[in-house]
């Protein structure tokens, strides 16, 4: 049997790959595989099946290769995706602006405490895992200071005050003077 006679649609294959990764935009797929958006566009229009992307996706996400290529069967065999992995909203923090990015799938056992309302923030070569439901305590926090988003070290002081460090100049302020967006519960950093 010839592979090209199977009637598979490359557009559908690439769309299922995006779905398995949790990407909502095609540019996220191009960025993930470190290719130009025009190269991805060629894959969509030329009709050649992207077997390499399908294989990488199956290995990275645990997605069922048969489902990726044909659309038949379950997306994740043994329901691995729903039982072990937790989908976390992804964001990029750059120049004090928080932008939506691709979702991350993280093994739920990675966290010692359940992450009920989490987000993953990519900034300066690290990924910060943030719990948006945490109550204010000393530690590393994602904060909004007059519209500028950053990750800062907060220390509670008497009189409903905070010591804020981690920027160019540490300062003290009232608890209500800055907005806390979530507590950093973990940091992932690659070592070169």
Swiss-Prot record:
Pfam families: Phage_CI_C, Phage_CI_repr. Keywords: DNA-binding, Repressor, Transcription, Transcription regulation. GO terms for biological process: negative regulation of DNA-templated transcription; protein complex oligomerization. It comes from the Viruses. InterPro entries: Lambda_DNA-bd_dom_sf, Phage_CI_C, Phage_CI_N. One of its GO terms (molecular function) is DNA binding. Belongs to the CI repressor protein family. Repressor of lysogeny. This is Repressor protein CI. It comes from Escherichia phage 186. The gene is CI.
